[in-house]
Design a protein with these regions (language model features):
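A conserved acidic beta->alpha catalytic loop
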Residues: 22, 40-51
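Catalytic core of nucleotide-sugar-dependent glycosyltransferases
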Residues: 196, 209-212, 218-244, 270
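Conserved nucleotide-sugar donor-binding catalytic segment
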Residues: 141-220
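Glycine-rich, basic loop-to-helix element that forms the pyrophosphate-binding segment
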Residues: 65-82
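Cell-envelope/extracellular polymer assembly enzymes that use nucleotide-activated donors
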Residues: 2-4, 38, 186
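Flexible acidic/His/Gly-enriched loops in nucleotide-sugar-dependent glycosyltransferase catalytic domains
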Residues: 27, 57-59, 101-171, 221, ...
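Short, well-formed alpha-helical segments that are part of the catalytic scaffolds
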Residues: 12-29
Length: 295
């Protein structure tokens, strides 16, 4: 079996050395088990030349956008060229465990599904790491549509996921999010709405989300803007329910209001969205995570 790792690069030279080292270690582990790795780098800063690393061997390929097109477009560009049965979208500044891809592949072969999700280390500003899924109850909610509509996205990054290439919805490949930050949220919603199946790769984290200070995913304003962008697109999707679009809009708007309001404002908007507030309190309790309310 072959895995294609697709990574958009935007002025990411400083990450290249660690990235290549990570891919080489994973390639070696896969090769020992009889699997292949293909790495596709998509240069989204075409004013700078991005070359395949000299020590990257023949499994590295570089595509260059004609202009800056954003993360979603770049991921789809790489996906179009991918030749693996499975694909991973890994960010330029994140890394995998040395056996991360192998363990995900083994999980895929043991329990075939459309997406295999592994645990993640979430880097903190103080240099520590937080393991993302810490309870069995949280694992049960990884692929639960209602949780995504009432609480928020439960996958830190597509870099912790192995996706069957032919399971990625055509709608996602044709309707692009223009604002960077939440095209993965958009992908998971479309896959769940289409009835795509998932499985969980247990054990230690396969993925390390590094805190760089530049992470878009840590900026709730940017990700909210991206969600509002894809909500407009979802209205054109014939299998995504309008009531679910409305619910997601309610949740994102409520949380944005809550974060920027004083105490009185928080109380006022919470009373107006009491069901969402209660859903988030329940989520925080069963998952034992402080990230429940603020996504």
């Amino acid at each position: 079996m072959k895995i294609s790792v697709v990574t958009p690069f935007y002025e990411g030279d400083r990450y290249m050395q660690d990235y290549v080292s990570c891919m080489e270690k994973n390639r070696e582990m896969l090769a020992q088990a009889g699997h292949e790795l293909e790495v596709i780098l998509v240069n989204d800063s075409p004013w700078k030349t991005l070359k395949a690393p000299a020590n990257g061997g023949q499994y590295f390929r570089v595509l260059t956008n004609s202009e800056n097109r954003g993360i979603h477009y770049s991921r789809v560009s790489g996906l179009t060229e991918a030749t693996g049965e499975y694909v991973m979208f890994l960010d330029q500044d994140d890394l995998l465990a040395e056996d991360g891809l192998l363990r995900l592949m083994q999980a895929a072969l043991k329990n075939p599904s459309d997406i295999i999700i592994g645990n993640a280390n979430l880097g903190q500003a103080d240099g520590s790491n937080l393991v993302w899924y810490r309870t069995a109850d949280h694992v049960k909610l990884i692929w639960d549509l209602q949780t995504y509509l009432n609480v928020g996205i439960q996958i830190i990054s597509p870099g912790q996921c192995l996706i069957k290439k032919d399971a990625i919805p055509q709608f996602w490949k044709e309707h692009f999010v223009r604002v960077n930050g939440a095209d993965d949220y958009y992908l998971w919603l479309l896959m769940m709405a289409a009835g795509k199946t998932h499985s969980f790769c247990g054990g230690s984290p396969v993925y390390n989300h590094r805190f760089t200070g530049d992470n878009i995913s840590a900026d709730t304003t940017a990700t909210d803007d991206s969600v509002y962008d894809f909500l407009e697109l979802l209205s054109e999707c014939d299998y995504f329910k309008q009531e679910d679009i409305f619910r997601l809009h309610e949740m994102i708007t409520y949380k944005a209001q809550f974060r920027k309001s004083n105490l009185f404002g928080k109380l006022t908007c919470t009373i107006a969205n009491l069901d969402i507030f209660i859903a988030n309190l329940k989520f925080k309790k069963v998952t034992k995570t402080g990230y429940g309310f603020n996504r």
